[in-house]
């Protein structure tokens, strides 16, 4: 079983996907974290967010994941970067980098490889991102598109930054999310959009437990299997 959860920044995708996967005894693949690892690779190489920058960085870049219990660990080469990719610095550049055609081609290939392998190994995988149900696994049997009010999304993202020790204001985070929304909706390659057969779920007033229940219930009601 392959389950995709897409939506804008701060809509609750990652936490919901991770906990739903644990409830279902599947594994969780955070595609956004993989893009953040690529962005960190660009920053370390001091490469511009351009096609030429991608062509310089990608040949020597290796992004992979490992699972330790229910937790997904992200690696950039041999370096564990799960915590570092959540920095505000990475957040400011990841959207520009993720729109580059060479980056998206590389990442979609990796996400399909890992997703299929983990679904075969564990019986199912839950992915979250922005194009998992439209590009990565367009035939997934369960697709959910999560949305939420922008102020609520900014509040959630601010909490993530504060937990990581970042000093940013609510206004800065809200502006960052507005910019990310615009970039995600208008980019030429794989813009953020709802798949025609995706279920729309507004999480603005929902608790995490309610969000997880929603996903788990939809998966249990679906007997198909998609790749």
UniProtKB/Swiss-Prot annotation:
GO biological process: pyrimidine nucleotide metabolic process
Keywords recorded for this protein, A-Z: ATP-binding, Cytoplasm, Kinase, Nucleotide-binding, Transferase
Recorded GO MF terms: ATP binding; CMP kinase activity; dCMP kinase activity
EC number: 2.7.4.25
InterPro entries (alphabetical): Cytidylate_kin, Cytidylate_kinase_dom, P-loop_NTPase
Binding locations of ATP: 7-15
Localization: Cytoplasm
Lineage top rank: taxon: Bacteria
SUPFAM superfamilies named among the record's database cross-references: P-loop containing nucleoside triphosphate hydrolases
Catalysed reaction, written as an equation: CMP + ATP = CDP + ADP; dCMP + ATP = dCDP + ADP
One annotated Gene Ontology cellular component of this protein: cytoplasm
Predominant subcellular localization, coarse grouping: cytoplasm
Pfam family, one: Cytidylate_kin
Enzymatic class: transferase
Family as reported in the entry's similarity comment: Belongs to the cytidylate kinase family. Type 1 subfamily.
HAMAP family on file: Cytidyl_kinase_type1
Protein name in UniProt: Cytidylate kinase
């Amino acid at each position: 079983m392959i389950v995709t959860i897409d939506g804008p920044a701060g809509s609750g995708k990652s936490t919901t996907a991770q906990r739903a996967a644990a409830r279902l005894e599947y594994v969780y693949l955070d595609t956004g974290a993989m893009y953040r690892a690529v962005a960190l690779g660009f920053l370390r190489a001091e490469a511009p967010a351009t096609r030429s920058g991608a062509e310089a960085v990608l040949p020597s870049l290796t992004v992979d994941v490992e699972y330790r219990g229910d937790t997904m660990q992200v690696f950039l080469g041999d370096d564990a970067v799960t915590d570092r990719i959540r920095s505000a610095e990475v957040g400011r550049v990841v959207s520009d980098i993720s729109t580059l055609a060479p980056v998206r081609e590389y990442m979609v290939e990796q996400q399909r490889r890992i997703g299929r392998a983990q679904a075969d190994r564990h019986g199912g995988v839950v992915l979250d991102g922005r194009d998992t149900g439209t590009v990565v696994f367009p035939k997934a049997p369960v697709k959910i598109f999560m949305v939420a009010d922008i102020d609520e999304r900014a509040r959630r993202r601010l909490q993530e930054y504060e937990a990581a020790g970042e000093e940013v204001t609510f206004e800065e985070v809200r502006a960052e999310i507005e910019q990310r929304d615009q970039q995600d909706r208008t980019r030429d390659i794989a813009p953020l959009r709802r798949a025609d057969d995706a279920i729309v779920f507004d999480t603005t007033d929902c608790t995490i437990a309610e969000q997880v229940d929603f996903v788990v219930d939809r998966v249990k009601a679906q007997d198909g299997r998609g790749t």
